[in-house]
Amino acid sequence: MMQKPCQDSYYTLFSSYTMLLDYHEEQAKNSRWIRCKVADLQVEPLGESSPLIGNLSAFAAGTSQEAVKDTAENLGLAMRVNGELYPVRMTAYKSLLDRAKIGGTALPKLSREVLAEVLNECLKLYSADALLLIRDEKISAVHSGDEVDYSVLPIDELLKVLQAKLDARFSGNEFESGYCDHSLVSASWRIVHCSLSSRWPLTTGKTYSDAA
């Protein structure tokens, strides 16, 4: 079965730099960054038995049944932001815990109902800002809203700078392949320079954010 971008396990491959750049330019256009107070975030359980699964109208416009079902099978949490409810992607889990300032190996063992309750009790203690990334129908990151801690660096802009630097230093460089999933972007170029002939993999990473 063909995967859809809303699914947590989605990935795609690229055979040319143009394909890689076009994909991330389109992704950047369709992504939303929302700044809000940590204390205003509200987490809701979205396990496989949750009544929310059968109530698509409860979610923000544009959220598909596939995104809701996939979330129920993975992280099992939704989040209300500025009055709108979104499924939460697995990639957002660590940054969500960071905003709540909690951690530990016991948390994943909790039921989604209890985990949501714990998160809400902790989140409401903090007045700091959060910077949320909404991408492919889900909340994909819950970063710190303090620009000292986190700044957005779009992958498409990074790729343009990288290609320009390669062209300036290594004439005739050739793009070999690219890969992207919801937590990582990687690409490799073949570089032939003077007496040097080798394959140099150049990798760009993103962890939810942009980079994610």
Explain the meaning of each model-derived region.
Residues 152-212:
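Intrinsic disorder/low-complexity polar-acidic segments
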